[in-house]
Design a protein with these regions (language model features):
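HAD-like aspartate-dependent phosphatase fold
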Residues: 2-260
Length: 260
C-alpha cells in the first residue's frame, strides 16, 4: 500500500513552503499504517521521516487517530511504539472512546452501563473509563451475574468473576449507557440497553408502560464511533458498532418494543 509515502511527499512540500511551526500530521492507523496486525514498511519509513530522518533534520509533530480502542491511550501508545520502532506518547493517541472524557464532568458520580470492549484481561475496559474519571461504571457482565435469567442463553463466565461488581441493582439508578467499543455479545448488550431505556428511573429489572415510554425521553446512550464497517486482515470488511450495524440493530429493537 502506498498511502503513507504519498502522504509524506505532500507533507515535505508543505513544510518547505509554509514552515515547520504550522505543520502537524494526524494518521489513521487501520488500513493506512497497518493491515490487521501487519505494520506496513512504508509506515515505518514515514514515521522515521517525521522523527527527523529527513533533509532538514527536523521533527514534525504527529498523532494517531483511530476508531479502534478497548485499551488505555498509554497502553496503545506502547503498542504503537513497538510497531513503529519509536517512542509514542499517550497524548499522541486519540482512540474511539477518548472523546468520552468530555462526558466526565456530567457523569463523574453517576451510575453508567458500559457496553462493548475486550473481555480480557477481565475488568480492563472498565478500568479505561475509570481512568477518565468515571466513578460508577457497571458492565453487562455485572448485570448478567446479578440476574442470570436476564440473558438465559449463556452463563456468566467464571473468568470474569474477579472483576465483577456485585451490587444490588434494584437500588442503582442508571443515568446513561456508554457503548465503549464494539460489542462482543450483541444479543445480551442490546437486551440490556433496551431494558434500561424502558426502565422506571433507570432501575434494571423495572419497566414503564409503553405510553409512559413514548411520553418520556429515553435514557441517553453514547456511541464512541459511528463506523458501519472496519477492516482487518480478513478479506471482507467487518461490521462495527456505528451507523448501520450495532446501533441500527439496537434502534430497531427499541422502536418495536416502544410501539408494541
Amino acid at each position: 500500500m502506498s498511502i503513507a509515502p504519498r502522504m509524506a511527499a505532500r507533507s515535505w512540500r508543505l513544510s518547505s513552503s509554509r514552515g515547520y511551526s504550522s505543520l502537524a500530521i494526524a494518521f489513521d492507523i487501520d488500513g493506512v499504517l497497518k493491515q490487521g496486525p501487519k505494520v506496513l514498511p512504508e509506515a515505518i519509513r514515514t514515521i522515521r521521516m517525521l522523527e527527523g530522518d529527513n533533509p532538514w533534520n527536523r521533527k514534525v509533530p504527529y498523532l494517531f487517530i483511530t476508531n479502534s480502542g478497548g485499551k488505555s491511550e498509554a497502553v496503545r501508545a506502547k503498542d504503537l511504539s513497538n510497531d513503529f520502532q519509536t517512542h509514542v506518547a499517550a497524548d499522541q493517541v486519540v482512540q474511539a472512546h477518548t472523546v468520552m472524557r468530555s462526558l466526565t464532568e456530567k457523569y463523574r458520580d453517576s451510575p453508567i452501563l458500559m457496553l462493548g470492549g475486550p473481555d480480557y484481561p477481565p475488568g480492563s475496559s472498565r478500568g479505561v473509563l475509570e481512568s477518565y474519571g468515571f466513578r460508577q461504571v457497571y458492565t453487562a457482565h455485572d448485570l448478567h451475574a446479578y440476574a442470570t435469567s436476564s440473558f438465559p442463553y449463556t452463563r456468566p463466565g467464571k473468568d470474569q468473576e474477579p472483576a465483577l461488581r456485585r451490587v444490588d441493582f434494584s437500588k442503582v439508578q442508571f443515568e446513561a449507557i456508554f457503548v465503549f467499543h464494539d460489542s462482543r455479545e450483541w444479543g445480551r448488550d442490546i437486551q440490556y440497553a433496551v431494558d434500561l431505556m424502558r426502565a422506571d428511573r433507570g432501575v434494571f429489572g423495572t419497566v414503564l408502560t409503553n405510553e409512559e415510554i413514548r411520553r418520556r425521553s429515553p435514557m441517553p446512550i453514547y456511541f464512541s464511533h459511528a463506523d458501519l464497517l472496519w477492516g482487518n486482515d480478513f478479506s471482507v470488511a467487518r461490521l462495527g458498532q456505528g451507523q448501520g450495524a450495532f446501533r441500527v440493530a439496537l434502534e430497531a429493537v427499541f422502536k418495536v418494543r416502544r410501539s408494541g
